[in-house]
Amino acid sequence: MKKIFLAMIHFYQRFISPLTPPTCRFYPTCSEYTREAIQYHGAFKGLYLGIRRILKCHPLHKGGFDPVPLKKDKSASKHSHKHNH
């Protein structure tokens, strides 16, 4: 699935996006963000993050720098609670 999603984004970036005026309010662009999210988080979580990003890319949102979030380290959060007795 990951390869299919990435191929679709590549097709969009290469053949469709150049035909339309730039309208994305964010850096990286929504398509690039989705590509990075899929590569970093996998097909389904990456696609979910990309859809969330696209939904907030509208004139009422100020946009700006919005990188793909890093993975949460579950083991670090379990060990970060220190007990002092």
Curated annotation (Swiss-Prot):
InterPro entries: Membr_insert_effic_factor_YidD (IPR002696). Coiled coil: none annotated. Keywords: Cell membrane, Membrane. Could be involved in insertion of integral membrane proteins into the membrane. Its main location: membrane. One of its GO terms (cellular component) is plasma membrane. This is Putative membrane protein insertion efficiency factor. It is a peripheral membrane protein. HAMAP family: UPF0161_YidD (MF_00386). It is found in: Cell membrane. Residues 62-85 are annotated as: Disordered. Belongs to the UPF0161 family.
